Curated annotation (Swiss-Prot):
Compartmental location: Cytoplasm
Species of provenance: Methanococcus aeolicus (strain ATCC BAA-1280 / DSM 17508 / OCM 812 / Nankai-3)
Molecular function as annotated in GO: GTP binding; GTPase activity; translation elongation factor activity
Ranges for region G2: 70-74
Protein's name in the database: Elongation factor 1-alpha
Record has Coiled coil as a keyword: no
Major location category of this protein: cytoplasm
Length: 428
C-alpha cells in the first residue's frame, strides 16, 4: 500500500470573470483527474458539432452540463494529485455557503490561489478581488499564490505580466499584510493550458514553477496539538450498554482515555472512558479527528450540540460579551446597535446582540475610518461589541484561532464574517 499523500485544501478565489473555473478545470484535466472516457465522449460530441480540435471550453461546458444533469462526477472533479499532495479544491467565495463553511470548519482552507486577469492592470482591480483577499485574510489563510491568467490575450507579454504583479503587490497585498516577496506569482493561460500543469514554451522570460508546482510549495497544515484541548460537540447519542456518547471533531489539543473533561457552557464534567472512530478504539484523539467517545458522569440531557469540551485546567471560555472585528458581506439595509442576528461559531448557533459599533475600518487596509459609526452596511469592516443572548463558547482568535471565528446569518444568508479579538469571560 503506497503511503497516502497529505491532503491540502486549497481555495481558489478571485473575480468571477478572471477564469477561475477554467483554471481549476485545467488543473483537473492536465493532472489526469477527469475520467478519460468522459473526455473522449465530449471530444466526439465536439467534433460532431463541428468543434473538432478538442476544445477545452467544450469539455468544461460539458462537465457543467453533466453536473446540471445530476451525473455525479462532481467529487472526482474537485480533487487532484500533485507530486506532494492530494489537493482538495475548496469551493470558492461567491458560494454563499463558502464563508459559513470556512468559519464553521467544514472546509478550512490551508492555502489560497488568487486567479486574476492580466488585463486588469489596464482597467483596475475588481472590487470582488479585494473582498476575497480581505475575507481569506480575516479567515486566517496566510498561504497565498497568484495565477495571472489570460496571458494568451496579451501575446504572453512580460511587460503586461509585470504591470499586473506590481499593481496587485502595491494596491492590495501589502495593504492586507501579505509580503509580496513571499508570494509566488505565475503567468498562466488556462484556456490553452500554459503553465497550469505543463510548462509553457510561450514565455521564455518566465523561469519559475508552474501553478501545480507552486501548490507543492505550500506548507501542510500543522496540527495544533500544543494548544489547550477544544472539541465542539456535533451530536450526543445514547448507546445501550455504553451510555452517553458525544461526537465531534477535535479542533485543538489532545484528548485521551482517562482524561477529566469539562463541557461548557453546560458546566458539567466527566471522565473519558473510551474514544472511537470508525468502530475502532483510539489511544488518543488529535486535531482533525472526528470521534465518538464514552464519558463517565455525564447524561445525554446534560450536554448538546454547540457545547465545547476542554480540560479542567483550561476550560472553554463562556463569553459574557466579546469584541469582534467583522466584515459585512451582504445586508439588504443597515446594521445598528440592538441588531440581533444568529452567530455561527464552531457547532454553536446563538443569537447575539450588537451592543456597540466602536470603529469603522477601511476594509483594504484595516485603518480606522470612523469612530462610533451610526450604522454598518454591506462592504463595511468594523470593530463591534457583542453580547450573546444565551451562554456560548468563543475564544480570542489570538489564543485559539480555531474557536475565534464566526459567521453571522440572518434572513437565510451569511450577512457578515468575523473574529473575536477580545472576550470577557463569564466563567473564569
Amino acid at each position: 500500500m503506497a503511503k497516502e499523500k497529505p491532503v491540502l485544501n486549497v481555495a481558489f478565489i478571485g473575480h468571477v470573470d478572471a477564469g477561475k473555473s477554467t483554471t481549476v478545470g485545467r488543473l483537473l484535466l492536465d493532472s489526469g483527474t477527469i475520467d478519460p472516457q468522459i473526455i473522449e465522449r465530449l471530444k466526439r460530441e465536439a467534433s460532431e458539432k463541428g468543434k473538432a480540435g478538442f476544445e477545452f471550453a467544450y469539455v468544461m461546458d460539458g462537465l457543467k452540463e453533466e453536473r446540471e444533469r445530476g451525473v455525479t462526477i462532481d467529487i472526482a472533479h474537485k480533487k487532484f494529485e500533485s507530486k506532494k499532495y492530494d489537493v482538495t479544491i475548496v469551493d470558492c467565495p461567491g458560494h454563499r455557503d463558502f464563508i459559513k463553511n470556512m468559519i464553521t470548519g467544514a472546509s478550512q482552507a490551508d492555502a489560497a490561489v488568487l486567479v486574476c486577469d492580466v488585463n486588469d492592470a489596464k482597467t483596475g482591480l475588481q472590487p470582488q478581488t479585494r473582498e476575497h483577499i480581505f475575507l481569506i485574510r480575516t479567515l486566517g489563510v496566510n498561504q497565498l499564490a497568484v495565477a495571472i491568467n489570460k496571458m494568451d490575450t496579451v501575446d504572453y507579454s512580460e511587460e503586461e505580466y509585470k504591470a499586473m504583479v506590481d499593481m496587485l503587490s502595491n494596491q492590495l497585498l501589502k495593504m492586507l499584510g501579505y509580503n509580496p516577496a513571499n508570494i509566488h506569482f505565475v503567468p498562466v493561460a488556462s484556456f490553452v493550458g500554459d503553465n497550469n500543469v505543463k510548462k509553457s514554451d510561450k514565455m521564455p522570460w518566465y523561469k519559475g514553477p508552474t501553478l501545480v508546482e507552486v501548490i507543492d510549495t505550500f506548507n501542510p497544515p500543522e496540527k495544533p496539538t500544543n494548544l489547550p484541548l477544544r472539541m465542539p460537540i456535533q451530536d450526543v447519542y445514547t448507546i445501550t450498554g455504553v451510555g452517553t456518547v458525544p461526537v465531534g471533531r477535535v479542533e485543538t489539543g489532545v484528548m485521551k482515555p482517562g482524561d477529566k473533561v469539562v463541557f461548557e457552557p453546560a458546566g458539567v464534567s466527566g471522565e473519558i472512558k473510551t474514544i472511537e472512530a470508525h468502530h475502532e478504539q483510539l489511544p488518543k484523539a488529535e486535531p482533525g479527528d472526528n470521534v465518538g467517545f464514552n464519558v463517565r458522569g455525564v447524561g445525554k440531557k446534560d450536554i448538546k450540540k454547540g457545547d465545547v469540551l476542554g480540560h479542567p485546567d483550561n476550560i472553554p471560555t463562556v463569553a459574557e460579551e466579546f469584541t469582534a472585528q467583522i466584515v459585512v458581506l451582504q445586508h439588504p439595509s443597515v446594521m445598528t446597535v440592538g441588531y440581533t442576528p444568529v452567530f455561527h461559531a464552531h457547532t454553536a448557533q446563538v443569537a447575539c446582540t450588537f451592543m456597540e459599533l466602536q470603529k469603522k475600518l477601511n476594509p483594504a487596509t484595516g485603518e480606522v475610518k470612523e469612530e462610533n459609526p451610526d450604522f454598518l452596511k454591506a462592504g463595511d469592516a468594523a470593530i463591534v461589541k457583542i453580547m450573546p443572548t444565551k451562554p456560548m463558547v468563543i475564544e480570542n482568535v489570538k489564543e485559539i484561532p480555531q474557536l475565534g471565528r464566526f459567521a453571522i446569518r440572518d434572513m437565510g444568508m451569511t450577512v457578515a464574517a468575523g473574529m473575536c479579538i477580545d472576550v470577557k469571560a463569564k466563567n473564569k
